[in-house]
Amino acid sequence: MARGLLVVFEGPEGAGKSTQLRLLADWLGARGRDVVAVREPGGTIIGDEIRRILLDPNADIVPRSEALLFMASRAQLVEREIRPALESGATVLLDRFFLSTYAYQGVGRGIPEADLRAANTIATQGLVPDLTLLLTMPVAAGLARAIDRGERDRMERADLEFHERVARAFEAFATREWQEGHPECGPIVLVDANGTQPAVFDRVLGTLHTRWPGTFPGL
C-alpha cells in the first residue's frame, strides 16, 4: 500500500487554518478519500492533557518548558496517530507542526534554533510533511478574529510585539533560501487568508492541484 500524504496547516493566530483544515477534510471525505485530521498540541489522550496545560491563561510556563511540552505532545501524536495513518494510506491533515515551533518558541520566545531542531528530531524521528500550507493575513486582523471567537488562551494573550515577530517569522519561512536550509520542514506554500472562507478554500484547493495534479478526485 502506498504511503499517505501529510499536509500541514500553519499560520499566525486568527488566520483561519483550523477552519480551512476542516473544510478540506470534509471535501476530501465526501470524495471517498480516507482522511485523518489532528491538531497540535493534542490529538491523543496525553497530548490533550498537555494542550490543557499549555493554553491555560493562568499557567506560568517558562519558554523552555513550553517548547518541551509541545515536543512531548508531538512525539505522542506522531507515534500513535500520524505514522499509523500514513502507513495505512490515509491523507493526514495536521493543524500546526514544527514550523510553529520555530515561529513561536524560536523567534517568539528566543529559544536557539539548534536546540529546537535537536528536540524535534527526537519528537518526529525524521517525519517530514509532504506540504505545508501557510495561511497569511495582517496580524491585527488575525488577532481580532481570535478575540471574536471568545475568551483568548495563553498563547493568544501574548502582546502585539510577540505576535508581530511570529507573523514575520512565518512569512520568512516561505522563502526558498530558508526552506533549503531547513529540509526537516518540507515544502511550504503561502496561501492568502484574506477574504471569505469559500474564497480562501478555493486558494487551498488550487494549491493542492498545482502541487499534485490528478492526485485528489475532483480537483
Label each region the model flagged.
Residues 27-124, 201-203:
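ATP-dependent small-molecule kinase phosphotransfer cores
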Residues 2-6:
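Pre-Walker A (Motif I) flank of P-loop NTPase domains
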Residues 25, 140-219:
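NTP-dependent small-molecule kinase module
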Residues 17:
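Conserved lysine of the Walker
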